[in-house]
Amino acid sequence: MAHKKGVGSTRNGRDSDGQRLGCKKFGGEHVKAGNIIYRQHGTKIHPGNNVGLGRDYTLFALIEGVVKFERMGRDRKKVSVYPAN
């Protein structure tokens, strides 16, 4: 057996925690004003009707209603909140 550890093993052994990005409310779900809909880095998804954009690009509902994901042209997506009937 080796009397020294393998060089790699002493330098490895760290891993940062995930940042919990992604979708928090899905299409068709009911939201209240202020609810976070999507956490992201940059505008992967753009804000649509009744959706606000936070400083860190978090999308949140401005009114109470139902979430709807939509397309903006061919390559962009947006999320909107429409009042529940």
Swiss-Prot record:
InterPro entries: Ribosomal_bL27. Keywords: Ribonucleoprotein, Ribosomal protein. GO terms for molecular function: structural constituent of ribosome. Residues 1-21 are annotated as: Disordered. One of its GO terms (cellular component) is cytosolic large ribosomal subunit. It holds the Pfam family Ribosomal_L27. GO terms for biological process: translation. Belongs to the bacterial ribosomal protein bL27 family. NCBIfam families: L27 (TIGR00062). HAMAP family: Ribosomal_bL27 (MF_00539). This is Large ribosomal subunit protein bL27. It comes from Geotalea uraniireducens (strain Rf4) (Geobacter uraniireducens).
